[in-house]
């Protein structure tokens, strides 16, 4: 089956939803070889994925994944980027997730170790002693108690191990980079997603709309980040009430200072940890704090807590300045990890 579809892709012929869904059953069951998988993914990337193809893959990924059943009432969101911007910035969406949760949102964070950056969200949670292999019911409890949790992609998507060799061999972006952030195990209907390419800005909301999404915001900054940036204008696409709207967000217009990309870049895993804690306890540089606030603002709008960016940025900054964000981190680490690790960084 897969060899026929590889031939089709080589001829630049699009696959149907059903063809993709069927071949993904074989791929994620381990019935195909590493070289077939690499060939398939490479040719798919070269052809360019259609929405039907992406949806066929996404539905099958979710069918094969573990799930969590959140007990929280109200809007549950996720916020993350597709990664791969190679800009070596600090962990913006992870930091912003704690700000959103401290400001009254509920964030079911889904993430992984870093693929092309210095530190991924999993690296941060793990550093503070969070068990990446927690079972779904325990994670649902953590979410209910703290309004934030972390679901490790490798734990929740065990079938993805069948494509890990092929993805490493290829060493380039494939459809899975795009679909990872969309395959949240808590089945969230409200998401902020940073994208690595402008072409996906309006495509992802439309794909997620077909899956019953409610509020989706995608972002790409003009300086190349798959997150909101305070060093340039940000292109934003919003799905709300079944309508898709494009917008541009200028950081200075929403009350922030223009910064430079170098202000938020890091070089080591230690830098990543220190930046994460530094923002939440309000000791990091202005650019890191304001970049986090702008990304948290996107999350607060998606979570139906704020109506516009000006209001949301102010709420995010106040949540950091009045100590609520750091207080949540302390309680979270006390409950799920090793508080001495946090004290060491915070007091350092």
Swiss-Prot record:
One Pfam family hit: Glycos_trans_3N
Protein family membership: Belongs to the anthranilate phosphoribosyltransferase family.
Binding locations of Mg(2+) 1: 93, 227
Descriptive protein name: Anthranilate phosphoribosyltransferase
GO BP annotation list: L-tryptophan biosynthetic process
Annotated 5-phospho-alpha-D-ribose 1-diphosphate binding sites: 81, 84-85, 89, 91-94, 109-117, 121
Quaternary assembly: Homodimer.
Matching SUPFAM superfamilies: Nucleoside phosphorylase/phosphoribosyltransferase catalytic domain, Nucleoside phosphorylase/phosphoribosyltransferase N-terminal domain
The protein's required cofactors: Mg(2+)
UniProt GO cellular component terms: cytosol
Note on cofactor: Binds 2 magnesium ions per monomer.
Keywords, ordered alphabetically: Amino-acid biosynthesis, Aromatic amino acid biosynthesis, Glycosyltransferase, Magnesium, Metal-binding, Transferase, Tryptophan biosynthesis
Binding site for Mg(2+) 2: 226-227
Binding-site list for anthranilate 1: 81, 112
GO molecular function: anthranilate phosphoribosyltransferase activity; magnesium ion binding
Catalytic activity: N-(5-phospho-beta-D-ribosyl)anthranilate + diphosphate = 5-phospho-alpha-D-ribose 1-diphosphate + anthranilate
Source species: Nitrosopumilus maritimus (strain SCM1)
Pathway: Amino-acid biosynthesis; L-tryptophan biosynthesis; L-tryptophan from chorismate: step 2/5
Lineage: superkingdom: Archaea
Binding site for anthranilate 2: 167
Designated gene of the protein: trpD
